[in-house]
Curated annotation (Swiss-Prot):
Annotated organism of origin: Drosophila virilis (Fruit fly)
GO cellular component: nucleus
SUPFAM superfamilies per record: Glucocorticoid receptor-like (DNA-binding domain)
Superkingdom field: Eukaryota
Function: Transcriptional repressor. Binds to multiple sites in the eve stripe 3 enhancer element. Plays an essential role in the segmentation process both by refining the expression patterns of gap genes and by establishing pair-rules stripes of gene expression.
Protein known as: Zygotic gap protein knirps
UniProt DNA-binding region: 2-78
Chain positions covered by the region annotation Disordered: 100-161, 231-294, 308-336, 420-442
């Protein structure tokens, strides 16, 4: 920067408080303006020379010179702006002042105040200018003239209705310096402030009316968008809940079928035995149901009477539509083959007369399936396959057969021990029979304890063996000798 300080003559650091000053004079003016009561009067009647060497000798004369060069507290109204911006604003002030002075007194000689011969003549000249300016303030057409001569000011300031005040012409730097020198020292603060004031939206950009309105509109928009998003989220959650929640199916109470006094054997199939191959009636109707329907176990009768066949068909349909499986019927993991073999140690032949029509329906249902499936290992109500060596080749069937053989062996031993006990108790005396009976009963109890875990492995068939006798169990099964 090729500028020098207007107060002391040192190289200027920038445009501060309305004038090019160094850092020292800038700091001095900032401190003295706020603490003007601590500055004493000049002892040399205000004739001290302020330069680079003796600028600190007299504070009163230094502050007076700061005012003379145009420094003011209002000069810092621009804030931390560039020097170009500050100088541009100052040049606009000079332009405005020159236009106002030329318009108010055409015939008046506006020579330089520094050409006046004495200090008193300068004061009188400044007073004359102030009086003329006060008269000029009463004219109503001054704002119109300023708007016509300087139409570029409103766009520069960014405020369409902003105009400079009327007493703008009195703030020419030379006139201000002369007026400050003519007044007493402590009356310098009574001088009018700078006329060049920025509009409120430039001084306080965060508090302008339009900015506040824009912020309010943005807040309202954000609130509306938040409400809209909440409504969309609630609708989406309701839709997903209705989509992924299975509908509740009312359980149809099954009407109990009248059972005859001497009912045949009821063999309960678990849900794991007939998930894919049901009996012919339930399999033909399961295609119209949803693929997620849980098939319940079906009570299958070995030799159902002819008059009860329609009733069994309806009962199996209603039970296959109910969604809740029966835990008591599906508790045994044994297959239908092992269950039927547990009833008799000999081979069981299929009943051809009862299964002729059901076999045709099962073959039609198997042909209607989507893909080929091997049904050789599947079981159904309609057909009871004859048992050969290939049906029990799996490891699971071998374990089940071994447990079943042990069960029959232990049961035979218990029967033999019981018979022996009865014969011994009838032939011997009372004392000896009591001792032998007690020992024999202890052995029977041990055998019964061994039988209980084996029978507990298959609760449905253990209970079946207890509740039914051998004659009713083998009523409808043909034994091949």
């Amino acid at each position: 920067m090729n500028q020098t300080c207007k107060v002391c003559g040192e190289p200027a650091a920038g445009f501060h408080f309305g004038a090019f000053t160094c850092e020292g004079c800038k700091s001095f003016f900032g401190r003295s303006y706020n603490n003007i009561s601590t500055i004493s009067e000049c002892k040399n009647d205000g004739k001290c020379i302020i330069d680079k060497k003796n600028r600190t000798t007299c504070k009163a004369c230094r502050l007076r010179k700061c005012y003379n060069v145009g420094m003011s507290k209002g000069g810092s109204r621009y804030g931390r702006r560039s020097n170009w911006f500050k100088i541009h604003c100052l040049l606009q002030e000079h332009e405005q002042a020159a236009a106002a002075a030329a318009g108010k007194a055409p015939g008046h000689a506006t020579g330089s105040p520094m050409s006046s011969p004495g200090f008193g003549d300068l004061a009188a000249h400044l007073q004359q200018q102030q009086q003329q300016h006060q008269q000029q303030q009463q004219q109503q057409h001054q704002h119109q003239q300023q708007q016509q001569r300087h139409p570029h000011l409103p766009p520069l300031l960014g405020y369409t209705g902003y105009h400079l005040p009327e007493h703008f012409g009195a703030r020419h730097p030379a006139d201000a310096a002369a007026a400050a020198a003519a007044l007493p020292f402590f009356s310098m603060m009574a001088t009018p402030q700078s006329a060049f004031q920025l509009p409120p939206h430039l001084l306080f950009p965060g508090y302008h009316a339009s900015a506040a309105a824009a912020a309010a509109a943005d807040a309202a928009y954000r609130q509306e968008m938040y409400k809209h998003r909440q409504s969309v989220d609630s609708a989406a959650s309701a839709e997903s809940h209705s989509r992924y929640t299975p509908p509740t199916v009312a359980t149809v109470p099954q009407q109990s079928q009248p059972q005859p006094a001497a009912s045949p054997i009821d063999v309960c199939l678990g849900a794991d035995d007939d998930v894919q191959s049901q009996h012919s009636h339930s399999h033909s109707h399961s295609q119209s149901q949803s693929p997620h329907t849980i098939h319940t176990p079906v009570a299958i009768r070995a030799t159902p009477p002819q008059q009860l066949l329609p009733g069994l068909t309806t009962a199996s349909h209603s039970s296959s539509a109910s969604p809740t499986p029966s835990k008591s019927q599906s508790s045994s993991p044994l297959s239908f083959t092992a269950k039927m073999q547990s009833l008799s140690p000999v081979s069981v032949c299929s009943i051809g007369g009862e299964t002729a029509a059901a076999n045709a329906a099962a073959s039609a249902a198997a042909a209607a399936q989507d893909g080929p499936m091997d049904l050789s290992m599947k079981t159904s109500r309609s057909s009871v396959h004859s048992f050969n060596d290939s049906d029990v080749c799996s490891l699971q069937d071998e374990h089940e057969l071994a447990a079943r053989r042990k069960y029959y062996q232990l049961e035979a031993e218990c029967t033999t021990i019981t018979n022996t006990t009865n014969s011994c108790s009838s032939s011997t005396s009372t004392s000896s029979s009591n001792s032998s009976t007690s020992s024999t009963e202890a052995a029977v109890a041990v055998k019964r304890q061994k039988l209980n875990p084996i029978g507990g492995e298959s609760p449905p068939f253990g209970g079946f063996a207890v509740t039914h006798n051998a004659s009713s169990a083998m009523r409808s099964i043909f034994v091949c000798v």
